[in-house]
């Protein structure tokens, strides 16, 4: 925590003025907005999945720094601080832009399609590719950790009142000495609404409400060269989230609740949560 406070203090000191929060989206699902050229974004997230007992619960702090290279190209990097690591929970991806594993991760986003469809409304699509390197030798379930590759795409519509985004992605885990975590395929759908009395311009507070749905399929892992039966599974979750923007600050939070789970004898999730604080700034 001391390291995070020092980093945040240095970044705040380097920020000369406010910027628009064009790169911020939902808590869990994928979204196509990217940062403007020269805009930096610092995220401090607290995420978790709660199971049937303390051995099943997962909680993590994750710090992510992003920068807009052009209007349509951005790069992000993130580091974890694990608070609680579940032994038997199915591996997955809690947030579209942040891994829930003890990995250092980098992601490149390219918005390849952007089109105005009316006053203050647009259609846009973005592809994300990245990779992660583990900070641990073994995963919580005893499997050897290995680097992974990540790819996803998000597309949708955004206006001053309504937001609708859909996305999907894939995470591949490498093999190491006969151990390999199961690949994860995921999708998301997000609807957002901005009530009329909140449709104000910067720098006034901006509050948006979302309903997010996330689905995951994780293949069974390989342990010592054999299929690991206590791994893999499917889940679909849905829940409410909200985003508050004020000047160069952002705060979003929400929860997802399972509507379908098939866990291959692993504990079911009760719910998952995410809280994220954001600071936008220019680096001159």
Model-derived features with residue positions:
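Bacterial N-terminal signal peptides that target proteins for export
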Residues: 1-7
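N-terminal signal peptide c-region/cleavage motif recognized by signal peptidases
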Residues: 14-18
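Active-site rim beta-loop-alpha module in soluble metabolic enzymes
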Residues: 180
């Amino acid at each position: 925590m001391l390291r995070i406070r020092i980093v945040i203090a240095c970044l705040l000191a380097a920020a000369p003025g406010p910027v628009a929060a064009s790169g911020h989206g939902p808590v869990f699902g994928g979204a196509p907005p990217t940062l403007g050229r020269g805009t930096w974004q610092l995220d401090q997230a607290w995420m978790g999945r709660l199971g049937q007992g303390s051995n099943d619960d997962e909680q993590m702090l994750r710090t992510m720094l992003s920068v807009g290279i052009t209007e349509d190209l951005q790069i992000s990097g993130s580091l974890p601080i694990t608070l609680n690591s579940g032994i038997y929970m199915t591996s997955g991806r809690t947030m579209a832009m942040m891994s829930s594993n003890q990995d250092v991760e980098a992601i490149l986003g390219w918005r390849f399609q952007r089109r105005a469809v009316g006053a203050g409304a647009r259609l846009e699509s973005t592809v994300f590719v990245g990779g992660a390197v583990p900070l641990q030798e073994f995963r919580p379930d005893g499997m050897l950790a290995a680097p992974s590759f990540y790819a996803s795409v998000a597309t949708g519509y955004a206006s001053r009142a309504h937001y609708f985004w859909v996305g999907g992605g894939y995470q591949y885990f490498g093999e190491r000495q006969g151990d390999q975590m199961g690949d994860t395929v995921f999708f998301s759908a997000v609807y957002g609404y901005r009530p009329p009395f909140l449709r104000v311009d910067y720098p006034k507070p901006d509050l948006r409400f979302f309903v997010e749905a996330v689905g995951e399929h994780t293949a069974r892992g390989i342990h010592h060269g054999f299929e690991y039966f206590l791994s893999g599974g499917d889940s679909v979750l849905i829940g409410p989230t909200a985003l508050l923007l004020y000047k160069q600050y952002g705060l979003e939070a929400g929860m997802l609740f399972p509507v379908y789970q098939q866990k291959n004898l692993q504990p079911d999730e009760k719910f998952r949560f995410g809280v994220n604080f954001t600071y936008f700034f220019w680096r001159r």
